[in-house]
């Protein structure tokens, strides 16, 4: 699959995975522009690549990103950071760019040093063969417990967008053992970081699998400007919402042990923040998830979960629909819950707070506990 103009990539099985699968990929932005935006984990324990890449991203110029699976390089002390630095330095030498413009991402087991000789040898092998047809293999190279690669593309007025992502377990709001790279050949404004942050907040940060966040989460956006097509801030946000939204849906569908996809839609909250808080309270509630997994349309557990949220509400005026059936009106019984069918994979929970106009949807990729 082809990358947007200005981008090249290549991948290799460097020997980081015992399976012999692809585990190392290098993506280069050849410009003429090198604008970048990034969002990282909120976990206080962060991997060495995140420490490095946060500093790189502050400059909002990224010329290359190297990603490996098969090892997280997290909780590895000073040597782990030195290894990340070495990786960026080596990529810089191979591509003739500053290491301070190279993002490094790792995913895999925590607490083990990376086999740097294999990474260096792998980079030496793929740097000379970078081309514009490596989207699929780059998506495969970052997989860990994922069962399928995640890819999303979009086009707008002659500009191309393409994204890859990985993440199957530990999915939770505020990123989710997740790596993602989104590329475009469009010309974008200096507000790319602000726009990308909003798109991330409303897509990746509204999915949940098991309530855990990772040490390594990194979502990167790069724009080469190679198409010459100028995309407005408004249109850029819409496109990023589409691409990130598609990747987030794919992550949810492939969450480890997932048997249900649960969409929790909160309506008429006093603010979007409150709507998100209520949705997350339900997404994290083990009693509610147990009911869903057991096929029990127990709307009382929905109300109980809603009540734990730090959000404005009238506890006597909440409506609940389960798969379209209004089982609760004004926090009291309505339609018989026996008319609700939870057999399908998709379960829809609609919570109407009736105190404002804001809304948000949180999606769960694993309904059992």
Regions found by a protein language model. Give the residues of each.
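A structural signal for small-residue-enriched, beta-sheet-centric alpha/beta enzyme cores
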Residues: 1-68, 72-83, 92-366
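Generic structural marker for isolated residues within well-ordered, non-membrane alpha-helices
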Residues: 88
């Amino acid at each position: 699959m082809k990358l947007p103009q200005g981008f090249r990539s290549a991948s290799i099985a460097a020997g980081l995975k015992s399976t012999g699968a692809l585990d190392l990929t290098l993506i280069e932005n050849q410009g003429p522009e090198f604008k970048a935006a990034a969002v990282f984990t909120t976990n206080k324990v962060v991997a060495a690549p995140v420490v490095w890449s946060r500093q790189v991203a502050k400059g909002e110029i990224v010329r290359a990103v190297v990603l490996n699976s098969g090892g997280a390089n997290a909780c590895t002390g000073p040597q782990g950071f030195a290894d990340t630095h070495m990786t960026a330095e080596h990529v810089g030498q191979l591509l003739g760019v500053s290491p301070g413009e190279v993002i490094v991402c790792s995913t895999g087991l925590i607490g083990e040093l990376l086999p740097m000789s294999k990474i260096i040898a792998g980079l030496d092998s793929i740097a000379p063969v970078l081309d514009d047809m490596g989207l699929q293999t780059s998506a495969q190279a970052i997989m860990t417990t994922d069962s399928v690669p995640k890819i999303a593309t979009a086009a707008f007025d002659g500009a191309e967008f393409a994204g890859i992502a990985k993440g199957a377990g530990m999915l939770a709001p505020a990123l989710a053992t997740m790596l993602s790279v989104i590329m475009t050949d469009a010309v974008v404004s200096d507000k790319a970081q602000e726009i990308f942050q909003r798109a991330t907040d409303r897509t990746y940060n509204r999915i949940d699998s098991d309530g855990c966040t990772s040490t390594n989460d990194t979502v990167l956006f790069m724009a080469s400007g190679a198409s010459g097509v100028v995309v407005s801030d408004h249109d850029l946000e819409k496109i990023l919402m589409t691409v990130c939204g598609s990747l987030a849906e794919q992550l949810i569908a492939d969450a480890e042990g997932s048997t249900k996809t649960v969409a929790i839609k909160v309506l008429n909250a006093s603010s979007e923040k409150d709507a998100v808080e209520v949705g997350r309270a339900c997404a994290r509630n083990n009693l509610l998830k147990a009911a869903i997994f057991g096929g029990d349309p127990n709307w009382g557990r929905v109300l109980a979960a809603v009540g734990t949220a730090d959000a404005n509400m009238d506890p006597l005026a909440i409506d609940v629909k389960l798969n379209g059936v209004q089982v609760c009106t004004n926090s009291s019984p309505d339609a018989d819950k026996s008319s609700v069918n939870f057999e399908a994979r998709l379960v829809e929970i609609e919570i109407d707070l009736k105190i404002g106009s804001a809304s948000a949807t949180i999606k769960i990729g694993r309904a059992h506990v």
